[in-house]
């Protein structure tokens, strides 16, 4: 099953996550089909906290990808900010 979830990046004490579309059996930071955005939980100043490619997310959801709980919250937040 395809899932949209967060893949951890960044460095120690500075987490950074990529929103990726991957098979649910793959490891968290393993191979993925596509990167559809990023999330920076420790953004400061002019740094962008959340960026999502809404068109690609809509496509992947239409073909059956399931977002993780945290990604679903982030997608809702992103849609609210875009409106």
UniProtKB/Swiss-Prot annotation:
From the UniProt record, give one GO term of the biological process aspect.
Answer: translation
InterPro entries annotated for this entry?
Ribosomal_bS16, Ribosomal_bS16_dom_sf
Matches recorded under Pfam families: Ribosomal_S16 (PF00886)
For this UniProt entry, the molecular function terms from Gene Ontology, in alphabetical order, are: structural constituent of ribosome
Signal peptide (from-to): none
- GO cellular component entries: cytoplasm; small ribosomal subunit
Q: Which UniProt keywords apply?
A: Ribonucleoprotein, Ribosomal protein
| Family in the record | Belongs to the bacterial ribosomal protein bS16 family.
PANTHER family recorded = 30S RIBOSOMAL PROTEIN S16, SMALL RIBOSOMAL SUBUNIT PROTEIN BS16M
Q: What NCBIfam families does the record tag this protein with?
A: S16 (TIGR00002)
Q: What is this protein called?
A: Small ribosomal subunit protein bS16
Q: Which organism is it from?
A: Pseudomonas fluorescens (strain Pf0-1)
Q: What is the lineage of its organism?
A: Bacteria, Pseudomonadati, Pseudomonadota, Gammaproteobacteria, Pseudomonadales
């Amino acid at each position: 099953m395809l899932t949209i979830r967060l893949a951890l990046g960044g460095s120690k004490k500075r987490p950074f996550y990529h929103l990726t579309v991957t098979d649910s059996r793959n490891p968290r930071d393993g191979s993925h089909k596509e990167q559809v955005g990023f999330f920076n939980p420790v953004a400061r100043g002019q740094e962008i906290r959340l960026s999502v490619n809404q068109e690609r997310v809509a496509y992947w959801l239409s073909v059956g990808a399931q977002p993780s709980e945290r990604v679903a919250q982030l997608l809702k937040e992103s849609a609210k900010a875009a409106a």
